[in-house]
Amino acid sequence: MKEVKIKNQDESLDYLVEELCKDSIEYKDIKVKKADRRMVMRSLMNIRMPNPISKEFLKVQDEFLKEEAIEKGIMSLDNIPTIREEYGSKIDYADKISIWQGDITRLAIDGIVNAANSQMLGCFVPGHKCIDNAIHSSAGIELRQECYEYMKEKRKVDLDYEEPTGSAVVTSAYNLPCKYVIHTVGPIVYKELTDKLRNDLKNCYLSCLNSAIKHGIRSIAFCCISTGEFHFPNEEAAKIAFSTANEFLKSH
């Protein structure tokens, strides 16, 4: 295949949108305004099924997303104070826990946690604001492909396999500044909050932390698991997250 000559981010964006349109039966002939290109690129990535694509596309996509990550601003752990430094907390392990509000896809740490769904393929809703969509969009289409390969192996044993609530799956991070993505499926609150749902959420945190140890992940950033689309009450979820992390540190 002839090598594509790309000079800058603008040309990369043109190429990626064009190739993603070609790759889509439904949208192969759409006309894209210059101002809408980045939104269209993300949307086409979101709806794309996990199928093979050219090495040249991946090369251009990877360079584009890595440069975009730099432009967004990469945040290292050294620049995030612990709760002891920030709030003067005197609780146990206050020097090992931080609270940070921001874009998790900017973090240059060992692992970030993704609030996934039971199909494990990311969010297919174009431009959706959920964490699953944000992480997959910034990582690149390779992440969905790896998740698909994981699910394909599981479904060799069980055709109807869905990732269970409270488990954790570790994948590469691809074009994110972190090293790994830890995917966990949180509980869904349909009506009242029950002890089982609380325990399910606790298991999400424990599974992620245990997986981190197994993979040599020494720094981990949790998003707010289940508090968005899955309707877990914010305050209750925060208490579970904090108490579970603290208990884990006591035994490790």
Model-derived segments and spans:
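Macrodomain-like recognition of ADP-ribose-binding/processing modules
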Residues: 1-252
